[in-house]
């Protein structure tokens, strides 16, 4: 399976222009699957525009499905799950059919105020895997990657690959550790602990007063960065899933030795 990381700068609030950019990339890609960032069809810093744009973004997903021509496409969008209830979503398009993955952890610190606009997904119903080009994969959106449970659950559901659409802005954690260093450490940890390929696709460019740094990357199940996109500018690149590397990683991994009672303890704390 060949995967294209499409690190784009969305036009904030301009769904039609964003759709045209998505369509051009999908139509010119020679990959089996094209992955875009979080909320790539709308832009991230939407605030109250969220309630105006969801109808347009749902129509854009339908048009993108028509243009996908047998490819797998993962695009960031807004989904109305019932009247007036919106979710930060990834549209997963396979052979023209659309399904959705919903964000579980909605950040409310710093610049983030997602709970004001979105309802979180329900893991008991919304956690799912997909199959394409011989690979089983799952999707988790940005903040979900900062918690261990979604990746662990997807791996135990049989995922070979975890895709992470994100909208991560520039910030520093402490005096010297930049956010991109934190993300790289996090992605390597998910890959190593769960013996999966991990693909992170970040937004790039400015939206309102925020600047998104890009730096998308693909990490092997052995914790090696196999592909790294540019910082601070749009970029796109393709890599191939190495199934032999996946087999080697799983031979030396204990990720299936899952002790469910840990989660019962956590639920009671």
Predicted regions span which residues?
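CN hydrolase (nitrilase-like) catalytic-core segments centered on the catalytic cysteine
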Residues: 57-75, 146-234
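Short polar catalytic/cofactor-binding loops
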Residues: 7-13
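Extreme N-terminal starter segment of soluble prokaryotic enzymes
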Residues: 1-5
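Short amphipathic alpha-helices and their capping/turn segments at secondary-structure boundaries
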Residues: 20-31, 149-158
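Short beta-strand scaffold segments in enzyme catalytic cores
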Residues: 75-77, 88-95, 128-130, 201, ...
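A conserved C-terminal secondary-structure "cap"
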Residues: 245-269
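Cys-nucleophile CN-hydrolase/nitrilase-fold catalytic domain and related Cys-dependent amidase chemistry
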Residues: 23-94, 99-104, 168-188, 192-196
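Active-site catalytic loop in hydrolytic enzyme cores
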Residues: 57-59, 81-161, 165, 170-185, ...
């Amino acid at each position: 399976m060949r995967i294209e990381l499409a690190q784009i700068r969305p036009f904030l609030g301009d769904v039609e222009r964003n759709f045209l950019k998505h369509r051009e990339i999908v139509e010119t890609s020679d990959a089996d699957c094209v992955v875009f960032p979080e909320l790539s069809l709308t832009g991230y810093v939407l605030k109250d525009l969220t309630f105006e744009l969801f109808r347009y973004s749902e129509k854009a997903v339908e048009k993108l499905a028509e243009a996908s021509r047998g490819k797998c496409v993962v695009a960031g969008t807004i989904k109305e799950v019932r009247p007036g209830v919106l979710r930060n979503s990834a549209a997963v398009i396979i052979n023209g059919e659309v399904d959705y993955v919903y964000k579980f952890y909605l950040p409310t610190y710093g610049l983030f105020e997602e709970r004001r606009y979105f309802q979180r997904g329900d893991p008991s119903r919304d956690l799912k895997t997909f199959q394409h080009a011989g690979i089983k994969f799952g999707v988790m959106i940005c903040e979900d990657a900062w918690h261990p449970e979604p990746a662990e659950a997807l791996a135990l559901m049989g995922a070979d690959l975890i895709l992470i659409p994100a909208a991560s802005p520039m910030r520093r954690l402490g005096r010297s550790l930049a956010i991109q260093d934190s993300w790289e450490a996090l992605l390597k940890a998910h890959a190593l602990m769960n013996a999966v390929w991990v693909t992170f696709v970040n937004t790039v460019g400015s939206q309102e007063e925020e600047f998104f740094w890009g730096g998308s990357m693909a990490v092997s199940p052995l914790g090696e960065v196999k592909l790294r996109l540019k910082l601070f500018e749009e970029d796109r690149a393709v890599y191939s899933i190495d199934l032999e590397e996946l087999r080697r990683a799983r031979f030396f991994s204990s990720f299936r030795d899952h002790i469910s009672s840990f989660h019962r303890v956590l639920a009671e704390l």
